[in-house]
Amino acid sequence: MKLKDYFKKQYEKGLWSMETITLIYMLFTTILIGIHRQGLADPQGMVLTRVLMLALMGVMYGAYRLYPCRALRIARVIPLLLGLIFWYPETYDFCSQYPYLDHVFAEIDQTLFGCQPALLFNKVLSSTFWSEAFNMGYYAYYYMMGATILFYLFGRYNQADKAGFVFLASFFLFYIIYEFLPVAGPQYYFKAVGVEAACTGDFPAVGYYFQNHTEMLTPEIKGIFSKLVIGAQEVGERPTAAFPSSHVGMSTVTMMLAWKTRNRWLFWVMFPVYLLLCCATVYILAHYLIDSICGFFTAILFFCFTSWLYDKLHPGYNTERD
């Protein structure tokens, strides 16, 4: 498709399914804000975030109505994807209203594997090469997802509505789990109880500890990618979203979407990065091994469910290439 064709007037009625599912998620979490408002640090700010997002979506839709073209319709997707950056930290605000369950998941790892894989993995592969390789994979998370969604928008436009729905709906399903299942992950839990205690198999319950404590273990910086990952965690990470791993889960959903494009270059270029990313979730202490394993299988379940749901809601959907 030529560049000028993206600006040719052509009105497509209705919302993106991504817009609809975002509005539903915003409504759902607004109800949660109302329920937990007494325990939340800044419920007014959370509501304001939703008002601003709604206003931005309205402005983007209004611009499209004034000059309907494919370029502006694609542009409407941008705030939906950027919204994930704001919705993620809120899972901590919600889940910290409940006692944390890290002792349960650390015990599961100990029972299944006879050790704490998160503590041993980076000791077994401690060289700068492996540290940088795994951190590179972890840091590529958002770039992989962004590349896949952009490929659909510009290379498989007629399939983009379904792909975007599957992607965002799966993300929101993970977020909903996190809002009710408080698990901080080993980088926070082992900092709280002590690495020595974890190595000896002592996993005390910490209750509401993470309501007021967000300190985490900081691994040694061995190169540019480990520095980038640590910097990103310092800015946006919270004691939340450990089980099941959305890094494994959503990268798996992304790989399945990439496969569905039938563009093998897209899939196979990302595949080794995907493997490094999955390993990195345990290597950098972000997840217990059971988190990552369950993240993989949860992704398959969510992908199948959201695909089925989309087909039910859009029985006449056109899946031809464009």
Question: Whereabouts are the PLM-identified features?
Answer:
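N-terminal transmembrane-helix/juxtamembrane module of multi-pass inner/ER membrane proteins
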Residues: 2-52, 71-146
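Membrane-interface helix-boundary motifs at transmembrane edges
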Residues: 10-11, 39-43, 63-75, 152-162, ...
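Aromatic-anchored segments of alpha-helical transmembrane domains
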Residues: 25-34, 83-88, 171-179, 274-283
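Hydrophobic, membrane-inserted alpha-helices
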Residues: 28-31, 56-60, 144-149, 249-256, ...
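Central hydrophobic cores of alpha-helical transmembrane segments in multi-pass inner-membrane proteins
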Residues: 50-65
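Interfacial segments of alpha-helical transmembrane regions
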Residues: 74-79, 146-181, 187-201
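Membrane-interfacial catalytic/cofactor-binding modules of polytopic membrane enzymes
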Residues: 180-260
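Membrane-embedded catalytic cores of phosphoryl/pyrophosphoryl-handling enzymes
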Residues: 223-322
